[in-house]
Amino acid sequence: MRHRNSGRSFSRTSSHRKAMFSNMCCSLIEHELIRTTLPKAKDLRRYIEPLITVSKSDSVASRRRAFDILRSKSAVGKLFTDLGPRFAKRPGGYIRIIKCGYRDGDNAPMAIVELMDRPVISDDTEE
C-alpha cells in the first residue's frame, strides 16, 4: 500500500532518482533553461526551490547543504554567487514551467523549465 507516499517513482530506484534530479538541478543552474518531460519538471520544483532558498544566505553550512545535493563545485559556486543574490528579494517561485508540446517517438508531454528573472541576451547585430 502506498499510503501517504508523495512524489513519483519514474520507474527508477531511489538512488537513480536522486542522481537524476541532482543532474537536472545542476543543468538548470548552469544553463538556466532546460527541456524535459512535464512530470519530471513538476517534481524538479521540489528539489530546486529549497536549494535556491538556501543559497540566499551564503555561509559554509548552507554551501555544504547545497553541495550534498548537487555534488558539483561549479554549480554550487554559481548558485551562491549569481542566483542567491538575484533572488534575494523574491519570497519563492523561482522557476517557471512552460508546456511545449509532445515528444516525437513516444508522445510524452514536454516542458521547458527556466529560472525567473533570467537575463535576456539581445541581438545588437541587427542595427
From Swiss-Prot:
Signal peptide: none annotated. Gene3D superfamilies: Ribosomal protein L17. PANTHER family: LARGE RIBOSOMAL SUBUNIT PROTEIN BL17M, RIBOSOMAL PROTEIN L17. It comes from Legionella pneumophila (strain Lens). One of its GO terms (molecular function) is structural constituent of ribosome. Belongs to the bacterial ribosomal protein bL17 family. GO terms for cellular component: cytosolic large ribosomal subunit. One of its GO terms (biological process) is translation. This is Large ribosomal subunit protein bL17. It holds the Pfam family Ribosomal_L17. Disulfide bonds: none annotated.
